[in-house]
């Protein structure tokens, strides 16, 4: 049984966007294969939200900058005694390859944006009950196509995101691994510290405490307030131990 809960909190806008994209891409595959209306709406709603996120910022530009930054960080370890040089070289080559694929790919989300079925469903998602069969006969008949035909189309849609997914996964993995967890203690439910130009906070908290963190701040300074899940009867101990990584 799980005894700890991992919380992550972005300390800047680019990280906030990346975590949202990662979450939405993960949600695309949760209910696959699509076998009914509920599964279809879950899928198309996440596709729609992904496209909304893509339209708000320069996702590709920020990712390419980060891929380059991670390469420069790794290059500082070349020739350092005790460091696995083959591993460093392999990571640098993987980052370069991910960048090349991303920069040559079509506009992120364009393939999904131009799909007729996705466009029709997106138009109805904001309307309460707007995806009934009489509102969306196209979706209704799509759900009655052979399963293999639907699966193939869904795989094609998801594959169109592969250049983004590959680059984002590499970047987030390297950022998450960039700092170890350290034991910390809050006093009366409060903890604050300097971020040291971190992009991401990762916090491990015992499930037994039934507390959750409210985090505020930015890359240079942050504060954590621990709150009880039971807002009426829950209590926050005077001293609370937890693990924190500033990545």
From Swiss-Prot:
One CC-aspect GO term: cell division site
A Pfam family that the UniProt record links to this protein: ZapD
Keyword hit for Protein biosynthesis: no
BP terms from Gene Ontology: division septum assembly; FtsZ-dependent cytokinesis
Localization terms from the record: Cytoplasm
Gene3D superfamilies per record: YacF-like (1.10.3900.10), YacF-like domains (2.60.440.10)
Lineage: superkingdom: Bacteria
UniProt keywords, alphabetically: Cell cycle, Cell division, Cytoplasm, Septation
InterPro entries listed in its UniProt record: ZapD, ZapD_C, ZapD_sf
NCBIfam families: PRK05287.1-1, PRK05287.1-3
Homology family: Belongs to the ZapD family.
Function according to Swiss-Prot or TrEMBL: Cell division factor that enhances FtsZ-ring assembly. Directly interacts with FtsZ and promotes bundling of FtsZ protofilaments, with a reduction in FtsZ GTPase activity.
Subunit structure: Interacts with FtsZ.
Protein name: Cell division protein ZapD
């Amino acid at each position: 049984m799980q005894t700890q809960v991992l919380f992550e909190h972005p300390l800047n806008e680019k990280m906030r966007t990346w975590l949202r994209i990662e979450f939405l891409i993960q949600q695309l595959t949760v209910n696959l294969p699509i076998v009914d209306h509920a599964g279809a709406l879950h899928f198309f709603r996440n596709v729609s939200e992904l496209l909304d996120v893509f339209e708000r910022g320069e996702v590709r530009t920020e990712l390419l900058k980060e891929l380059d930054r991670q390469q420069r960080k790794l290059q500082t370890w070349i020739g350092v005694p005790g460091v696995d040089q083959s591993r460093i070289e392999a990571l640098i080559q993987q980052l370069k390859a991910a960048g090349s694929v991303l920069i040559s790919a079509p506009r992120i989300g364009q393939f999904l944006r131009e799909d007729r079925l996705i466009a029709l469903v997106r138009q109805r998602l904001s309307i309460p009950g707007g995806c009934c069969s009489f509102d969306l006969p196209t979706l209704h008949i799509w759900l009655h196509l052979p399963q293999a035909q639907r699966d193939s189309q869904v795989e094609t849609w998801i594959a169109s995101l592969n250049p983004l997914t590959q680059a984002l996964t590499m970047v987030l993995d390297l950022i998450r691994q960039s700092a170890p967890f350290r034991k910390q203690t809050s006093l009366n439910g409060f903890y604050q510290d300097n971020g040291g130009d971190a992009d991401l906070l990762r916090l491990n908290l015992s499930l037994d405490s039934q507390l959750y963190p409210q985090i505020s701040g930015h890359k240079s300074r942050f504060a954590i307030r621990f709150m009880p899940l039971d807002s009426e009867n829950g209590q926050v101990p005077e001293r609370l131990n937890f693990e924190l990584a500033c990545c």
